[in-house]
Amino acid sequence: MQHQLVVKRLGRQDYEPVWKAMHEFTDQRTEETPDEVWLVEHNPVFTQGQAGKAEHLINTGDIPVVQSDRGGQVTYHGPGQLVAYFLINLRRKKLGVRDLVTTIENLVINTLKAYNIDSAARPDAPGVYVDGKKICSLGLRIRKGCSFHGLALNVNMDLTPFLRINPCGYAGMEMVQVSQFNGPSDVETVEKQLIEELVTLLDYERVEFSTEAPSQGNKA
């Protein structure tokens, strides 16, 4: 199972049902459960991470705010943004948390490089940046040696809701996206490149694709 990966393409989804399904998957997985990556575009929502502070919500207006249990502070999700959730058994992969963060950042950097977009990570603020402007946010949670939550890569979206918050707790943090650097404007194209890079970086040999929505069981 160490080299097997299931990739689920979930399409457009509200945040909370997917969040609850991630919890359930992580709670129920065993040592034999293959790792999964869930690819999704969320309907408009602000999510507060565990370090989130109310003062970073400037004017949320009609966009809902959800208190999440991922690391980090506030961010925005909306259509045209690629969200990837990494449900990985870190012990089985022999990865530490810092290793996983670095791997995810490199995953995005390599994906953007395929479109001739030069980007970099920052030691003081997780995520990926182009000329100091944020193109990808990152927030994770670890339970029972397994990760959940993940990244949000801006592809071709309305960035104005980011002006209603201090993204990731940084006042004036400018957000950018793939399409403005002559990269693809459709999320699906970027998804394919991202998964190719992930399979290489984390040494998966068997990859199964699915559009089946994750089960939420009886959780409310």
From Swiss-Prot:
Family of the protein in this entry: Belongs to the LipB family.
Domain BPL/LPL catalytic positions: 31-206
Site keyed Lowers pKa of active site Cys: positions: K134
Pathway: Protein modification; protein lipoylation via endogenous pathway; protein N(6)-(lipoyl)lysine from octanoyl-[acyl-carrier-protein]: step 1/2
Keywords attached to this entry: Acyltransferase, Cytoplasm, Transferase
Protein's organism: Vibrio parahaemolyticus serotype O3:K6 (strain RIMD 2210633)
Residue sites binding substrate per the record: R70, G71, G72, Q73, V74, T75, Y76, H77, S137, L138, G139, G150, L151, A152
Name of the protein this chain belongs to: Octanoyltransferase
Classification via NCBIfam families: lipB, PRK14342.1
First-level EC class: transferase
Organism domain of life: Bacteria
Additional remark text: In the reaction, the free carboxyl group of octanoic acid is attached via an amide linkage to the epsilon-amino group of a specific lysine residue of lipoyl domains of lipoate-dependent enzymes.
UniProt-listed PANTHER family: LIPOYLTRANSFERASE 2, MITOCHONDRIAL-RELATED (PTHR10993:SF7), OCTANOYLTRANSFERASE (PTHR10993)
One Pfam family linked to the record: LplA-B_cat
GO annotation terms (biological process): protein modification process
SUPFAM superfamilies cross-referenced by the UniProt entry: Class II aaRS and biotin synthetases (SSF55681)
A GO cellular-component term linked to this record: cytoplasm
